[in-house]
Amino acid sequence: PLDGFMMGSRTGTLDPSVVTFIMEKEHLTPSEMDQILNKKSGLLGISGVSSDDRDVTKAAAEGNQRAQLAHDILEYQISKFIGGYLVALGGCDAIVFTAGVGENQSHHRQVVGEYLKFLGVKIDPELNEKMVLGKEGKISTPDSSMEVYVIPTNEELVIARDTKALVEKL
């Protein structure tokens, strides 16, 4: 589960030749390399602080350059993936930020909005700041080319609904 943008302790998408290069250079076993890719990379590996973005955010605010670099990379990667999907889909009506970072880190959403500004995406800074800690709502400006929302994740509800649907088929 490494594909996509960088996660708390996972690399996200990377060039496969990097894996063998590092293994050979550092004399690592496949198991050791797997641990690095899945448990010691991502925000943790780059920041050197934590896999929890709240800790990385605090460190970046205190001037930790590695923590800031981790944020810069994460925001770039999120923007790149949104851009890639916009091309694949031929556009979209809305962008939705969800899950831990998407729901609770307004600064990441604001930076991603800046990356997407050339597409006409506009995030309202005041609305964006208000949409944290379980709040749900629209954060784009009225003249944005796409609507942008923050919607909290409810994985337990999805699991419960899927389980109910499966049980009803028995």
Spell out what each predicted region is:
Residues 1-51:
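Glycine-rich phosphate-binding loop plus the immediately following alpha-helix
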Residues 5-12, 46, 68-71, 102, ...:
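Hydrophobic alpha-helical scaffolding
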Residues 93-115:
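Glycine-rich phosphate-binding loops at beta-strand->alpha-helix junctions
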Residues 134-170:
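Structural signal for terminal/edge beta-strands and the immediately following C-terminal loop/tail
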Residues 30-34, 46-53, 85-92, 123-129:
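Flexible, glycine/charged-enriched surface loops at secondary-structure junctions
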Residues 42-46, 53-88:
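Adenine-nucleotide phosphate-binding core of ATP-dependent small-molecule kinases
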Residues 120-133, 140:
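Enzymes that bind and transform nitrogen-containing heteroaromatic metabolites
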